[in-house]
Amino acid sequence: MKAVILAAGEGKRLRPFTETMPKVMLSVGNKPILEHIFDSLKNTGIGEVIIVVGYKKEVIMEYFKNYKKIKISYVTQDKQLGTAHALLQAKNHVKSPFVVIPGDNIIDKKSIANLIQDKSEYSMLIKEHSHPSKYGVVFLEKGKLRRIVEKPSEDIGKFISTGIYKFPKKIFNDIEKISKSGTHSLSSVVETLVQHGKTINTIKADQWMDIVYPWDILDVNEAMINNVSSVKSGTIEKQVTIKGNVSIGKDTKIYSGCYIVGPVSIGEGCEIGPNACIFPSTTIGDNSVIHPFTEVKNSVIMKNTRIGSNSFISNSIVAKGTIIGNHFSSTEGENVVEIEDEFKKLKNLGAMIGEDCTIGSHVIVDPGIIIGRKCDISPIKHIIKNVSSGSKVM
C-alpha cells in the first residue's frame, strides 16, 4: 500500500520557525516531524510514499531523498489551495487504496496499522480531545461518520478528525466533482460524501498530536522524548550526574559537574558544561554548546546554537544557529501571545527565538515573547514585546 503525505504548507502561525523551512521539517525530539511519520510507517505494509510538497520543497527533498527502505516520490502543489487540492496532485501516482497523512501530525504505528487493516472502503482516524473546538469535531452513529463541524465556536462533542484517512482510488473523482462547488479541504469533501450517503468508518487513534502554534513544539517534543532510550555515545567526564533516560550523541562532551535529569536528548558534537544543569523534556540539537553554570529545562534547543554561561532557559524554543551571551534569562509565566492577528493567553511559556539571532549578555526576555529570525539584540536589554525578523535592538 502507498501513503500520501501532505507537506506543501508553510505554517504561517509557526513563524519565525517556518521562515526557512516548511512546518513538517520543524525539529521535535531531535528529528523533523516528517521523519517521525516515516518511523511510524515502517513495518506497517507501506512500501511507497508520495509526498506533496510546495513551500520550501527543496528542504524536504534534500533531507529525505529516499528514506531507508521506503521509496519516495514527490509531487508539487504550486499554489496552496487546500488539502483536497493538495491530494489531487498525487492522482497519477495512486492506483489502489492508499493512506493520507497530514505532514504536521504525529501518529503512532499501531493506529496506522489499524487503519490499513480496516476492511471499509473509506476510513478515518479520530481522536478524543479535551478541546475539540480547535479542530474538526466529528459526530458518529454506530462507529460511522455522521458529520464534521469545523472549529465550532464552543466545545461540542468529544472526538476530532485527525485528517488521516484511507481512501480508494475513486476519491480523486469525488474531489474533482465536489471541488467544483468551491470546496478545497479534505474534511469538506468527506462531509459532502457522507451527505450523499457514503459510509465512512471511524477508528480511534491511540497517540496523535499536531503542531499549529510555536508552543505546540514544546508539547510534541515532550511526548517524543518521553520514552527516549538511554544511549551514551559521547564522552562523559567524572563527577557528572545523570538520572533517568538520557540520550547523548556521538562526539558530544559532557564536562564535570553537570547534572542531567531525563528524559533528555542531546545530539552529536555538542559540548555541555562544566557545571550545567539540563532538566526533563529538553532536546539539544547537534553541534550546540551549553556553557558553564547554565540551566535548561523543558526546552527545544536546535542545532548549532551557543548559550552563554550563567543563563536560564525554561519552556523555550531556540532555533538553529542562534548565539546567546552570558547571563541570559527567558522568564516563564503567563502572557498573551499574538500570532497572525490571533491572541492566545498562555501559562508557563518562556521565549521563542528564531534562527541565526545574536543576543548579547545580560538580556532578559519576558514570558511568551517571540524574537524573529536574524535579530541582533545588544547586551543589557529587557525584551517586553515581540521582535520582528531582521530587527536590531540597540
Give, region by region, the residue ranges found by the protein language model.
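The conserved acidic donor/metal-binding loop of glycosyltransferases
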Residues: G103-I106
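Short N-terminal binding/cap micro-motifs at the start of the first secondary-structure element
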Residues: G11-P16, S133
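Conserved donor-nucleotide/metal-binding helix-loop-beta segment in metal-dependent transferases, i.e.
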Residues: K110-Y135
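Glycine-rich hexapeptide-repeat left-handed beta-helix
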Residues: H291-M394
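Catalytic-core segments of class I nucleotidyltransferases/pyrophosphorylases
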Residues: I116, E141-N226
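Extended, small-residue-rich solenoid/repeat segments and analogous flexible loops
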Residues: K180-T183, T192-S281
